Design a protein with these regions (language model features):
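Walker A (P-loop) phosphate-binding loop of ABC-type ATPase nucleotide-binding domains
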Residues: 45-48
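Conserved ABC transporter NBD signature motif
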Residues: 66-74, 82
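Conserved ABC ATPase "signature" region
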Residues: 106, 110-133
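Conserved ABC ATPase signature
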Residues: 137-141
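Conserved catalytic motifs of ABC-family nucleotide-binding domains
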Residues: 158
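Catalytic Walker B motif of ABC-type/P-loop ATPase nucleotide-binding domains
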Residues: 162-165
Length: 174
């Protein structure tokens, strides 16, 4: 029995064009296959295109060329299906300071159309050790707590793929 591809990338290229003739090739014909159940990491120096690749998956950057396929769905033809299959934890912490972790997770679940009766907010808060801060303002959380809250937001819709950019930055060992 063959393993199913969770993620298949073929000849993925991203070129950033400046107004001048300077072009920056952030990704150049990237090919990658990640099988179901596999844990995979991207390593490389600053500016190697790791975050650009993750931003293409997240839909915040448009690829120049190539194919992105997630669980058999093509990004160009099924962007909503692809993005609902992925939980993204961005490198930058960007949370609304005046919402609580619980409220932020509830809002995120609502964006994915998850009915209130099916939401797992408290379970996720416990999983990332934020149950005691569930009703505090996000602005009162430490940097590591905010990072864990981003992980919780990425998991709220139970995606089969979790993509983390700099996942351990500012997070305590436990």
């Amino acid at each position: 029995m063959s393993e199913k591809n969770a993620l298949k990338i073929e000849k993925l290229t991203k070129i950033y064009s400046k107004k001048s003739s300077n072009k920056i090739k952030a990704l150049n014909n990237l090919n990658l296959e990640v099988k179901e159940g596999e844990i995979f990491g991207l390593l490389g120096p600053n500016g190697a295109g790791k975050t650009t690749f993750l931003n293409i998956l997240a839909g915040t950057v448009i690829k120049s060329s190539g194919n992105v396929n997630v669980w058999g769905y093509d990004l160009d033809n099924n962007p909503r299906q692809v993005r609902s299959s992925i939980g993204i934890v961005p490198q930058e912490v960007n949370l609304d300071a005046f919402f609580s972790p619980r409220k932020l997770l509830e809002l995120q679940a609502g964006l994915y159309g998850i009915p209130k009766k099916d939401r797992i907010t408290d379970t996720i808060l416990k999983l990332v050790s934020l149950e005691k801060q569930a009703d505090s303002y996000a602005r009162s959380l430490s940097g590591g707590m905010k990072r864990r809250l981003l992980i919780a937001k990425a998991m709220v819709h139970r995606p089969p793929i979790l993509v983390l950019d700099e996942p351990t930055a500012g997070v305590d060992v436990q």
